[in-house]
UniProtKB/Swiss-Prot annotation:
Organism: Clostridium perfringens (strain 13 / Type A)
ZnF endpoints (unnamed): 3-34
PROSITE patterns registered for this protein in UniProt: ATP_CONE (PS51161)
UniProt domain ATP-cone: residue ranges: 49-139
One of the record's GO molecular function terms: zinc ion binding
Sequence similarity: Belongs to the NrdR family.
Name of the protein: Transcriptional repressor NrdR
Cysteine-cysteine disulfides: none
InterPro entries: ATP-cone_dom, NrdR-like_N, RNR_NrdR-like
Amino acid sequence: MRCPYCSYEESKVVDSRSAEDYNAIRRRRECLRCSKRYTTYEKVEDIPILVIKKDLSRESFNKEKIISGLIKACQKRPVSRAQIEEIAADIERNISNKMMVEIKSDYIGEMIMERLKDIDEVSYVRFASVYRQFKDINTFMEEIKSLMK
């Protein structure tokens, strides 16, 4: 690590501790030439996740899109913003833990529906109607009947 004061490349770590909810390490360093101290942060580099859409195009994973879809599905329902954000965070964590670099949008949609089904069935049906592109009332009824089993 190059000293920001004299550009010398040698330093020693004086103090080290977790920072940013344990997602980074904060280090206090001391330059071995000028003896000035400075702070550095060490963080694991995020691996970009690509979502494979239905038309086979790819786009970067965006947790905000999940949150936006959930907000629409849960509008005027007893589902809190915290619950919505927790679902999105759980899905992102699930994908990251599986070390997936590419994931089909269908898989994400199914994970969302699985979580919504346990929280609020009306929100689940709303989300499913858009996600599965229900064409008529019969498709709606089939989904509702499957919920009632």
